[in-house]
Amino acid sequence: MSKIVLLIVVIVGVLGSLAVALPQRPYTQPLIYYPPPPTPPRIYRARRQVLGGSLTSNPSGGADARLDLSKAVGTPDHHVIGQVFAAGNTQTKPVSTPVTSGATLGYNNHGHGLELTKTHTPGVRDSFQQTATANLFNNGVHNLDAKAFASQNQLANGFKFDRNGAALDYSHIKGHGATLTHANIPGLGKQLELGGRANLWQSQDRNTRLDLGSTASKWTSGPFKGQTDLGANLGLSHYFG
């Protein structure tokens, strides 16, 4: 375990030096900003080290790029995995924003597990999230997970806030899925969010895919009670590694 932690620390430093090559697109931030959960670490064969990533089109401009280095120890059903990553947008004009870098350490035992993720976006915020996952159903085609999460966040201006909650996540082997999330930000209110995703096309090797996604969220308490936010996106992605 100590070797995995040491590897994470070393690689975070390496990715930090590469961060300037992947500028991130600007975000609109009408409320407290919190990004979607980071992409879960992929599961690899025991003791295999893998460099991978993805490139996804962005209708707002540029492409969203991600680079990650993962190391797993164990079997596909029972393992510990460490990952370091950097993510941003390739667009540099008219405005570019810092690249988000981070590290994840996860444990999985037949679909049940724990995950710790630390992220840093210079000039924007720092976050530390803990997630517990329990697999409720999996028959090889349909999968249903229950998750509980807690995160501690600090914005660049020094403002700190927590975000805690639970979620149900359904996924289909063909790439379709839906997620229902209930979150609480103490002192600000509670939110209910429903997200859906559909795979419209994928290459034979499944490395290139066209996906449609949508989200709808509503504040159920606090000063923003009743306010809703809707979003949708269509993206072409290519995965490597």
From Swiss-Prot:
Glycosylation site residues: 39
Main location: secreted
Protein known as: Attacin-C
Role, per record: Has antimicrobial activity in synergy with other peptides. Strongest activity observed against E.cloacae.
Annotated signal sequence range: 1-21
Keywords of this entry: Antibiotic, Antimicrobial, Glycoprotein, Immunity, Innate immunity, Phosphoprotein, Pyrrolidone carboxylic acid, Secreted, Signal
Induction of synthesis: By bacterial infection (at protein level). Detected within 24 hours of bacterial infection.
Subcellular location: Secreted
Impact when changing residue 165 to E: In strain: Berkeley
Gene Ontology cellular-component terms listed: extracellular region; extracellular space
Tissue specificity comment: Hemolymph (at protein level).
Family, per entry: Belongs to the attacin/sarcotoxin-2 family.
Record-level GO BP terms: antibacterial humoral response; defense response; defense response to Gram-positive bacterium; humoral immune response; innate immune response; response to bacterium
Other remarks on this protein: Not induced by bacterial challenge in imd mutant flies. Level of induction reduced by over 90% in 18w mutant flies. Toll loss-of-function mutation has no effect on induction by a mixture of E.coli and M.luteus; but strongly reduces induction by E.cloacae.
Sites of Phosphoserine modification: 127
Positions where Pyrrolidone carboxylic acid occurs in the chain: 24
Prodomain positions: 22-23
